[in-house]
Amino acid sequence: MAEYLKQANPPVQAIDTATAATVQQMLADIQQGGEEAVRRYARDLDGYSGDIVLGTDAFLQAERALSDGVKQDIQYARDRVCGFAQLQRESLLEFQSELRPGLIAGQKLIPVSTAGCYVPGGRYAHAASAIMSVGTAKVAGVDNVVATSPARPEVGVNPAILYAMKLAGADRVLALGGVQAVAALAYGLFSGHAADVIVGPGNRFVAEAKRVLFGRVGIDVIAGPTESAVIADETADPDVVAADLVGQAEHGPDSPVWLITTSRALGEAVIARVPALIEALPDVARAAATAAWRDYAEVVVCDSREEAVQVSDEYASEHLQVMAEDLDWWLAHLRNYGSLFLGEETTVAYGDKCSGPNHILPTKGAARYSGGLSVGKFIKTVTWQRLDRSASREVGQIAARISRLEGMEGHARTGDVRLHKYYPDEAFELGTLGGHGAQIA
């Protein structure tokens, strides 16, 4: 039976009505007031009154602000992420098949026309996130990719984010953050192209705006705080495990980190090491990690690796690391996670920044039914079919009978009219409303 060496504080199941009300009001204001309302919110909330649509001068200035080494690192990340996305794209196939003589059906892949990519820029400069969203959309074949990131007063968009956006292929870049940015993407403001899909992580206001707009636009996930779990057995190095937990706790004061271990000694050793690692962080990261570890961290000791799998699947963590023997066994048995990192040589930070697979992942248990951002989010998988008259003769009779069984006479008659047109001298058994067997000439 699982034993907790450390448990998170009991969750507060509060409904954030204030955030919801604020977002609803802002979306209504922007839908009515358009671009001027967006400018007003950018000015009032972010203190930014500069250009919203960024052009060549801004991109060149951002490029000049970065060292060659930084640009090379961003290019490396772009190559890995877009390369992985290209492999995903190649795994998606169109096909057609003759299901019976004269009945041909197929599957077609159609990219959405416009994607909106939100790139956060608050506590940290998320250059990698720009690549994850914009680059993946372009590999998927999206014609219009509109990217947006918060601008700071007198500074604008972080140059690393701006450079990454342009490098990844953004067709238009907006200096906007928060609800006003999401609204601009959804309503097509400053671009003339209303987004079909909006992706990218953000704060609770961004997440709520995406939730409200879902249906009008497609979204990736309603992102919550970043989560990370580590599964470790007695062979794991407690120093490495502790470093990885702290590294993810710095995301924010409400970012859960969980250790699932089959070794009590390892769990106790990790708990002992974490405080010193947190204390050594820079101020902003230290404050976030301190709160996250204190309030949201858990350390669970399991009797077996099978129980560890069960506990992990219940967490359904956004990120899941495994530092244990027989990595292939874990790969085969684990089911619920956003992205899996196998072995000590592999850490979440690699995936967060540059190794290839996307870092925009499901949170709050959504990994039970959803995966991370991929090219598939930007591609509609649609079907088509074509029948000749011989196939229509067979299918039409059965469709008419099923339609009448269901009480849908209008549906049935669309088959009737074709059968009588193509085969006027034949009689067919086309069913009766609510039953079978009647013959209609």
Give names to the regions the model predicted.
Residues 95-163:
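Conserved small-residue-rich beta-alpha loop and adjacent elements
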Residues 1-113:
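N-terminal Rossmann-like NAD(P)+-binding subdomain of aldehyde/semialdehyde dehydrogenases
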Residues 305, 313-440:
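C-terminal core of ALDH-fold dehydrogenases
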Residues 1-4, 172-177, 299-304:
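Short acidic-hydrophobic, aromatic-tinged amphipathic segments that line or gate anion-handling sites
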Residues 143-153, 257-264, 270:
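Short internal beta-strands
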Residues 169-256:
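Conserved NAD(P)+-binding/catalytic subdomain of aldehyde/semialdehyde dehydrogenases
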Residues 251, 259-337:
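A glycine- and small/hydrophobic-rich beta-loop-beta segment
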